[in-house]
Amino acid sequence: MALVDAYKKVVDFLNNNGYSYFIIGGIAAGTLGEPRVTADVDVDIVINKKDVPDFLGKAAKAGFKVPVKKCLKSVEQVGVFQISFSDYHIDFIIASTDLESQAYKRRKSIQLHGVKAFFPSPEDLILMKIIPGRDKDLLDAKGVIIRHKGKLDIKYLKTWAMKLCDEAQDMRIWQALNKLLKD
């Protein structure tokens, strides 16, 4: 069993059950930017916390390994949860920010590994990668910038970077974006 099988399984599950989602993390970075190794599937999902138990039940019936108590505790504490398929983890981040709300309106359907899945726009993935600020995330953002050079909505990027900086009262995101756009 390979990571691609876990990816296909979760995408089919989400699509067949009508969940609103998009793929993020290393798979999105490799699809929209430069390919890189990743060991899991990361999903941003629109779901009310009260609906997570039903989601977990459906996932278990679909063949995923679901540590229900651990998932529910994690949802309450940090708004994320993890299930698995074979040896691969699938991390779900519950959408909760204005940027995620906007990204859902702009998401794109992309055929990858024989299944259609939703991915954020290149601009939204760049912003989502800059926010944590880890080296690998900044490299992912740079890869997306390089791949979409001349096609990015720079005004959108800068508007959201400034908004995020205002909310955080920290200019790091603005500075990181401008550095990545210049390099």
Give the predicted meaning of each segment.
Residues 1-183:
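Compositionally biased terminal segments of proteins
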